[in-house]
């Protein structure tokens, strides 16, 4: 997941999608599946299709429509696709997925969502043993382990590799004769199974099934591998029982996943409505209107408005054509960029006490600009409510987060942050309130590492200050 320096947000990490169907245009199905997952990655995209003998790969930089100008034309019954934000490895054409390799056991195409915590150690061992790496992605470690495995079948080779890697990984892989889905023993990143009329699909999120009219079947369990071929779907629990410890990323519900998805049985949209309700229960602010930062906290703001009876209003308008900014701006440029993307409506906010909902505050650089804009437009008071607890620790499970010292809540109290962003009041949703919001998931099954530093998979010392370029 990437950090947006203008809007002070962590962004989605990657999206993976796969199809096994002998009766459809597989490349087109993968394309539309990736289109539905575009929110999970906007740096690059790739599609690989196969007939079991040959593989055709199309890939490129940018959004899906920019990256894939022409679909693969190889008649095929299997395909996998990937949209990417760089987590480990720089934003470089050689790091575009899926990764396709031909080796003595056949050919495979691998799409990976997540981040491996032991990639550096494995890569050093493999290089010492003669392996050559072409990219700076941790995902390339996976294909090397598969290729070097002594197991007899491709599926067994994949399981063998999966048992050696640690951290976050949801994989969609095509082999010579099957489509394979693999989820790590903690289930950090989502992966689900769907059914087409005559085949099956795998996806990071259930929302992508709707795009191709596929039927949702179930979620892939932590530590599980599914193998799809002409005989149907087989399931293997590849991980050792003592390794399986469900820890679903709670930020999928707060911000990452699309609102119309269900992640492991929990509606993302309902979760966000509930977060707004819980924010009201914890604050009971007396205000005139409830607002959100467009595209960030809107559903939670609706939940707050419903619970409180305070009217919801759109007091900020977003310029949908402003695009993303990948430069690291100085404060003046950041303020200009925010003002280019957002504009306050004086006739809506003038003289009002505003409850402003956001889903998170990472560095605090943008919140103050928005509060300033609202007050310049005549707002009487601004009460900032955040639908997540304070982010005090970096994530090492598929998110390119800031180093800890750059996280404002790691070095400042809530009162200090309130003063820094010039809000009249500031409240973060408690962990207890968050658990109430994500009510269909047991609290012990959620990962809160970015809030409390409780890492369920050990993080090597060399990665404690960030993992993005650790393999370069």
Locations of the language-model features?
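Conserved short alpha-helical segments that host acidic/polar catalytic motifs at enzyme active sites
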Residues: 1-222, 227-287, 293, 381
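Flexible loop/turn segments at secondary-structure boundaries
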Residues: 26, 87-88, 118, 188-189, ...
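Generic beta-strand/beta-sheet core signal
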Residues: 111, 174, 182-183, 194, ...
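Secondary-structure transition/capping motifs at alpha-helix termini
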Residues: 131, 151-152, 282-288, 306-313, ...
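A conserved beta-strand->alpha-helix junction
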Residues: 135, 140-143, 312-323, 420-438
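Phosphate/diphosphate-binding loops
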Residues: 160, 208, 215-216, 223-224, ...
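PRPP-dependent phosphoribosyltransferase catalytic core
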Residues: 162, 177-178, 213-219, 372-472
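Short, glycine/charge-rich flexible loops or terminal/linker lids adjacent to PRPP-binding catalytic cores
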Residues: 309-355, 365, 392-400
């Amino acid at each position: 997941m990437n950090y947006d320096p203008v809007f002070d947000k962590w962004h989605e990490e990657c999206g993976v999608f796969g199809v096994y169907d002998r009766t459809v245009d597989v490349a087109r199905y993968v394309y539309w599946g990736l289109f539905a997952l575009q929110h999970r990655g906007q740096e690059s995209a790739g599609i690989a299709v196969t007939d079991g003998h040959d593989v055709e790969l199309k890939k490129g930089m940018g959004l899906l429509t920019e990256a894939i100008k022409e679909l693969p034309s190889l008649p095929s019954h299997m395909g996998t696709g990937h949209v990417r934000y760089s987590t480990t490895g720089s934003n470089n054409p050689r790091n575009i997925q899926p990764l396709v390799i031909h080796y003595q056991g056949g050919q495979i195409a691998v799409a990976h969502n997540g981040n491996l915590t032991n990639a550096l150690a494995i890569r050093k061992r493999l290089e010492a043993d003669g392996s050559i790496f072409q990219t700076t992605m941790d995902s390339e470690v996976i294909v090397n382990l598969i290729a070097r495995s002594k197991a007899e079948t491709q599926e067994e080779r994949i399981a063998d590799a999966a048992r050696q890697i640690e951290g976050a990984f949801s994989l969609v892989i095509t082999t010579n004769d099957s489509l394979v889905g693999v989820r790590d023993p903690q289930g950090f990143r989502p992966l689900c199974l769907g059914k087409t009329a005559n085949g099956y699909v795998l996806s990071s999120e259930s929302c992508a099934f709707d795009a191709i009219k596929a039927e949702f079947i179930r979620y892939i369990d932590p530590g599980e591998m599914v193998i799809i071929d002409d005989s149907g779907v087989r399931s293997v629990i590849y991980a050792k029982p003592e390794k399986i410890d469900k820890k679903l990323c709670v930020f999928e519900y707060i911000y990452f996943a699309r609102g119309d998805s269900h992640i492991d049985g929990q509606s993302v949209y309902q979760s966000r409505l509930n977060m707004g309700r819980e924010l009201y229960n914890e604050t009971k602010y007396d205000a005139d209107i409830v607002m959100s930062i467009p595209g960030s906290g809107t559903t939670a703001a609706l939940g707050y408005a419903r619970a409180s009876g305070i009217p919801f209003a759109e007091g900020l308008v977003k310029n949908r054509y402003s695009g993303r900014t990948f430069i690291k701006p100085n404060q003046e440029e950041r303020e200009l960029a925010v003002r280019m993307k957002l504009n306050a409506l004086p006739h809506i906010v003038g003289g009002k006490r505003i409850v402003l909902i956001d889903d998170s505050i990472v560095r605090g650089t943008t919140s103050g600009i928005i509060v300033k804009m609202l007050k310049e437009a005549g707002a009487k008071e601004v009460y900032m409510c955040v639908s997540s607890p304070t982010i005090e620790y970096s994530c090492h499970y598929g998110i390119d987060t800031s180093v800890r010292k750059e996280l404002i809540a790691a070095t400042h109290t809530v009162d200090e942050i309130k003063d820094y962003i010039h809000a009249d009041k500031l409240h973060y949703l408690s962990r207890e309130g968050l658990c109430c919001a994500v009510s269909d998931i047991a609290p012990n099954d959620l990962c809160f590492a970015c809030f409390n530093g409780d890492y369920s998979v050990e993080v090597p010392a060399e990665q404690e200050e960030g993992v993005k370029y650790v393999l370069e």
